[in-house]
Curated annotation (Swiss-Prot):
A GO BP annotation: methylation
GO molecular function: O-methyltransferase activity
UniProt entry tagged with the keyword Methyltransferase: yes
Primary enzyme class: transferase
A Pfam family of this chain: Methyltransf_2
Enzyme Commission number, as recorded: 2.1.1.-
Pathway annotation: Secondary metabolite biosynthesis
Family indicated by similarity: Belongs to the class I-like SAM-binding methyltransferase superfamily. Cation-independent O-methyltransferase family.
Organism: Aspergillus brasiliensis (strain CBS 101740 / IMI 381727 / IBT 21946)
Alphabetical UniProt keywords: Methyltransferase, S-adenosyl-L-methionine, Transferase
Active-site positions on this chain: 326 (proton acceptor)
Protein's job: Cytochrome P450 monooxygenase; part of the gene cluster that mediates the biosynthesis of bifonsecin B, a dimeric gamma-naphthopyrone. The first step in the biosynthesis of bifonsecin B is the production of gamma-naphthopyrone precursor YWA1 by the non-reducing polyketide synthase albA, via condensation of one acetyl-CoA starter unit with 6 malonyl-CoA units.
Protein's UniProt name: O-methyltransferase bfoD
Binding-site list for S-adenosyl-L-methionine: 275
Amino acid sequence: MADCLSSQLERYANQVASSAGIIISHLKTLKDEPSTLPSETTVPTAIGTAQLQLAEAAFQLLHLTRDPGNVLTNLTVDLQVISSVRWLLHFEIPSLVPQEGTISYQELSCLANVPDNLLRSHLRLAMTCHLFQESGPTGMVAHSAVSRKLASDPSLAYWGQYFANTVFPTATQSVNATATWADSKQLNETAHNLAFDHRGTFFDYIAQDPARTVEFANSMRAVSTTGPFDTCHLCKSFDWSSLGDGVVVDMGGSTGHASITLAESFPSLRFVVQDLPDVVSDSIKRLEERQLPLSVTSRIRFQGHSLFHLQPVKGAAVYLLRQILHDWPNQEAIKILRSIVPAMGPKSRIFIADIVLPKTGSIPATEERVMRCNDLLLHQFTNTLERTFEDWQAIVSRVDDRLQIQHVYRDPGSILSLLVLEIV
């Protein structure tokens, strides 16, 4: 029997007070207190746990205290917030507002070449979500901590532009895609096909233009720096130091963001990052531009390779597929895994870092909703869906009789699980 409303309110309110108390005590020990909380992945474990618990309890309280009759009002607000963020990104407002100091609406509208009244409307809605702020009695525009990060962090800017220009238009075609193709499993009958008026698969579409390939790679690198997807969770999901100086083949590794994170944490491991030639060429340049220590870059090399071709690197310690297989239907996922098996040595493992869909309500809602969101995004782009553990088992069982899932782990705060596959 479900808790009564008063019990739920009391439980979540107590959790908010308790978790906030832990975080406040920690903040008071710091020499320079930050204006916003850092990612839970960058603070001591107890503080990170408190941040996650606080976010979940506050989220539940928000929904418990909302009138169910206002659901459409709330959804309308959420939709317009998304629309305003897209508008602000399109006209490059974050980069036009000074990093420090203020700017008038009139001057900002001139710089962006947009109507003053529309600029005010979009900015003031965004301000209710802590994007930008007004300063002074005359209403000057200034950055908030969030918008300043959006303007100054290239990775976040890439993701913002990709969201505005690709993800948002694709999502708006979801209804039309279902109405047109119903239960189609074809990779080229998707919301993305309708949004961008093309007849190939999503990966065909980005491969047709090197700029699209690079844009997609940059957006994936950006996503990997956000809390639920942060590559640091990968470091905590396995005892990587036990591999010594073994080789990790980062298949479909894009710009090498996962390998770089692992290389920085485990100084003996070596890495081969594989992806399409256009991505590899750009990634090598980007690695050089980052000016990372030689102790890191000397252990990372890039290699052009198709996921569906036989794996050329033999006997690696790990073949890593991070957020790769979820892009492909079952049959293609099986082909990708089969391409690896002949290259495996007696101690080789395949690591699948992907979402394992939970039973509804079995994990914090703040984490589950990100997984469910990703589930729909996949369908809109590739006509695939995220998988349950049973789905993953079914795929692995069809690859090779000897290949088995030996271990599954999900780091707290991560939406990705690590499935460890071995030949037994």
